[in-house]
Amino acid sequence: MNAIAVSPVQHVGVIGGGQLAWMLAPAAQQLGMSLHVQTPNDHDPAVAIADQTVLAAVADAAATAKLAQACDVITFENEFVDLPALTELEETGVRFRPRPAAIASLLDKLDQRQLLTRLGLPTPRFLAIAAATATESELTALGFPVVLKQRRHGYDGKGTQVLRSLAELQQALQSYGDTPLLLEEFIPFEQELAVMVARSQSGAIATFPVVQTHQQNQVCRWVVAPAAIPGALQKAVAAIARTLVETVDYVGVAGIELFQQGDRLWVNEIAPRTHNSGHYSLDACQTSQFEQQLRAIADLPLGSTALQWPGALMVNLLGFEDHQSGYAELRQQLAALPGACLYWYGKTESKPGRKLGHITLPLSGASSTERAQQAQTMLAQVEAIWPNPDTAHQP
């Protein structure tokens, strides 16, 4: 945590009440800010830490107008919002950070791809399709395997499929009805990367270390910071992040996911909010992504994003069964691991693949090779306590 400045913003509204809003709480308290949350369920994680809660769907603009009455500024925990309605609210004086205009090209994956293309940034080839009318020539245009995505409202593996033949693709399309879809070229990457970037109202920019991420069933399983990539690639990733937030006049923290193959990069997706790949920063960086989010939207000086440890491993604690349990014994065992920083989101129901919490562990190795070996050892220790959803029920 940085030295505390007096913030001109005292009351922050957050649209969305999941764990990303919940993790804003310690930084908000340190910065002297109150948090007001709009979320549909009274058992959502952020309700427990909110100074005030508006119980309503995140796309309910009337509820957002009510939220705004108590807030100096409103930010976002997720992107499932009604953008035209928010734009109308902004015209009445409601202050959103980032502004609706800044996220307009980031909510729809087709708009993201078109933005990247206009900016000359590396992106997989893509094609917008409709399930009911797509022709065979369209479906085969990008070859196979191919990635099929919902253009909106897909997250944590929902709405994303890797398909290996025309028959598989045609079968998958039958379940989408008239949902707007995107076909993308499959990139045979060496590793997946991510970076968090913050931009303040005054235009200051800070990028966090580039990290390696590992996805399991399209859901982030673990993150290693920093990524073992050459300095030139680190600079290229930071340049991409800077270009994106400057171009759309973005204020706040955003996450950018990329593919890496040799010395080449492709932007996978852009998340206009704090992001799972940045959770390690809560303990491993001088400033967490959550403190940085609050600093950016309040136009306070951005904090240092430097690592406080040589490296870090963050492991998501994904649900491995349908159950209603707090898993107290397992959490106690995880917390006893050397250097462990454990976060439990307080969700009332476990489902396979659902994010229930995360654990961050320090890596002390002086080289990327040593840190990679440590990370594998620590991952095995975590999975000996908390089952991997893919192997939890194997004999």
Curated annotation (Swiss-Prot):
GO terms for biological process: 'de novo' IMP biosynthetic process. Its EC number is 6.3.4.18. Pathway: Purine metabolism; IMP biosynthesis via de novo pathway; 5-amino-1-(5-phospho-D-ribosyl)imidazole-4-carboxylate from 5-amino-1-(5-phospho-D-ribosyl)imidazole (N5-CAIR route): step 1/2. Homodimer. Catalyzes the ATP-dependent conversion of 5-aminoimidazole ribonucleotide (AIR) and HCO(3)(-) to N5-carboxyaminoimidazole ribonucleotide (N5-CAIR). It catalyses: 5-amino-1-(5-phospho-beta-D-ribosyl)imidazole + hydrogencarbonate + ATP = 5-carboxyamino-1-(5-phospho-D-ribosyl)imidazole + ADP + phosphate + 2 H(+). Keywords: ATP-binding, Ligase, Nucleotide-binding, Purine biosynthesis. The gene is purK. Residues 113-298 form the ATP-grasp domain. ATP binds at residues 109, 149, 184-187, 192, 268-269. This is N5-carboxyaminoimidazole ribonucleotide synthase.
